[in-house]
């Protein structure tokens, strides 16, 4: 438990186990990636704008993003440029983009959510102000692990969001949904527990999937709700259950 909590707060870069100045290390790493893997490789003219956008995204992850809104925020003439900047950041392994699940292709293409490729990038940069939101950090860790587990040839990870509620992740194999996952650091509040379970039930009905999982920091139980079996598992067990 203590080791996981350290990972949750520090991130997964091995160097951070011995690095005394974590902020300096992360700043240097991000700076090198932006300069060498993005700016030089793609001949970016407006480096400062690119850096500001990437830092902005890392400050608000995990969150839905809009290329039009980013273009307006950073005074970029075209949303295509904003889209390219985000694509460059993803290819350089600073962020990862998760698309919205929908039976309609245009919805999947049009909606997206950004995650950090490592939680160390969320709050250890000089321009960071995201703080220690453990719920966001836990959600990001689960997403990173889902990417590791899924086969890119026939499996995908999406998020689900509807007016009635939302589910953090929908895991698909081909066109079939094989699991709906919610992530919540603490479900001791009755309101939080109800919201997370409701998201799973909405996901189950929309996707016709019966495998429903709620990942938390330490809770563990299984029960039936509205005819569906819901499994609540502690994240440290889920992470080692390959």
Give residue ranges: language-model regions.
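Short, hydrophobic beta-strand segments that form beta-sheet elements in well-ordered domains
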Residues: 210-216
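Accessory nucleic acid-recognition modules appended to NTPase machines
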Residues: 17-177
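Domain-level recognition of nuclease-like catalytic cores that cleave nucleotide substrates
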Residues: 217-242
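Cofactor-binding loop segments of dinucleotide-utilizing enzymes, especially the Rossmann-like FAD-
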Residues: 119, 216-217
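Active-site ExK catalytic segment of metal-dependent nucleases
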Residues: 177-189
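Amphipathic alpha-helical segments of the small helical/lid subdomains adjacent to P-loop NTPase cores
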Residues: 1-12
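Short active-site-adjacent structural elements
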Residues: 167, 189-192, 221-225
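Short, charged, amphipathic alpha-helix that recurs within catalytic cores of restriction-modification
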Residues: 193-208
């Amino acid at each position: 438990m203590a080791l996981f909590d350290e990972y949750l707060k520090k991130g997964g870069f091995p160097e951070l186990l011995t690095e005394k100045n974590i902020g300096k290390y992360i700043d240097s790493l991000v700076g090198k990636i932006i300069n060498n893997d993005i700016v030089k490789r793609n001949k970016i003219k407006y480096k400062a704008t690119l850096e500001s956008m990437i830092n902005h995204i890392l400050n608000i992850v995990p969150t839905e993003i809009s290329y039009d809104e980013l273009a307006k925020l950073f005074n970029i003439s075209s949303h295509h440029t904003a889209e390219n900047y985000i694509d460059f950041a993803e290819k350089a392994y600073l962020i990862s983009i998760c698309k919205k699940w929908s039976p309609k292709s245009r919805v999947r293409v049009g909606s997206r959510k950004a995650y950090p490729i490592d939680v160390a990038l969320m709050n250890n940069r000089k321009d960071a102000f995201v703080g220690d939101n453990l719920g966001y950090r836990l959600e990001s860790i689960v997403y990173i692990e889902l990417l590791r587990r899924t086969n890119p040839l026939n499996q995908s990870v999406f998020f689900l969001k509807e007016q009635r509620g939302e589910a953090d992740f929908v895991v698909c194999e081909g066109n079939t949904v094989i699991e709906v996952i919610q992530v919540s650091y603490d479900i001791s509040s009755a309101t939080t527990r109800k919201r997370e379970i409701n998201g799973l039930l909405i996901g189950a009905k929309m996707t016709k999937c019966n495998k429903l999982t709620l990942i938390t920091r330490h809770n563990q139980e299984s029960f039936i709700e509205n005819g569906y079996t819901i499994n609540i598992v502690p994240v440290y067990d889920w992470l080692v259950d390959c």
